[in-house]
């Protein structure tokens, strides 16, 4: 129900707007005046036929038609020819040794011997600095390689020493086990030898006692 009433209200609103609002036939800017109104009505037929965009807008007061000359700056702009701009395509790779920074100049002065000498000296300085930088970088690379090799050797020595300690501990443990076994065998042999000696000693003593008793019986 609310939707139907809303649609009806919108239809009535749009119908009222279309009936009451009209585009005016003319727009009045000046205050109401009989002379202006009459002149305006006389010139409406001519002014309403073709509408042209004026060349310039001139603001004048008190209904005065002040003659203005063509602006000087417009004549100057139209009379001044445009110079073509010289644009150069930037190179893909910027190399200071081959292309110095003065390649951006569009118009170079005539080369002089002094300028050539200055450029040659600057080029030599750049090449010397580049070679020194290359040698320095190579020296740093050699140093880093040597340091890396030394560190690798130290790491290998430490690793081998650790491995050696592990191997030594294992071998020592095996040797200790072997020594324990040999000591146990020696102890058992000593016990058996002591038993044999006791038996032999008792037999010898018994033999001598028997011989002495027999000798006394005779």
UniProtKB/Swiss-Prot annotation:
It is a single-pass type IV membrane protein. The keyword Transmembrane applies. Residues 217-218 are mitochondrial intermembrane. Residues 167-198 form a coiled coil. The keyword Mitochondrion applies. GO terms for cellular component: mitochondrial outer membrane; peroxisome; synaptic vesicle. The modification Phosphoserine is found at residues 129, 131, 146, 171. GO terms for molecular function: protein homodimerization activity. It holds the Pfam family Miff. Keywords: Coiled coil, Cytoplasmic vesicle, Membrane, Mitochondrion, Mitochondrion outer membrane, Peroxisome, Phosphoprotein, Synapse, Transmembrane, Transmembrane helix. Signal peptide: none annotated. Residues 1-198 are cytoplasmic. It comes from the Eukaryota. It is found in: Mitochondrion outer membrane; Peroxisome; Cytoplasmic vesicle, Secretory vesicle, Synaptic vesicle. The modification Phosphothreonine is found at residue 89. GO terms for biological process: mitochondrial fission; positive regulation of mitochondrial fission; protein targeting to mitochondrion. The chain crosses the membrane at residues 199-216. Belongs to the Tango11 family. Homodimer. Interacts with DNM1L. Interacts with C11orf65/MFI; the interaction inhibits MFF interaction with DNM1L. Plays a role in mitochondrial and peroxisomal fission. Promotes the recruitment and association of the fission mediator dynamin-related protein 1 (DNM1L) to the mitochondrial surface. May be involved in regulation of synaptic vesicle membrane dynamics by recruitment of DNM1L to clathrin-containing vesicles. This is Mitochondrial fission factor. The lineage of its organism: Eukaryota, Metazoa, Chordata, Craniata, Vertebrata.
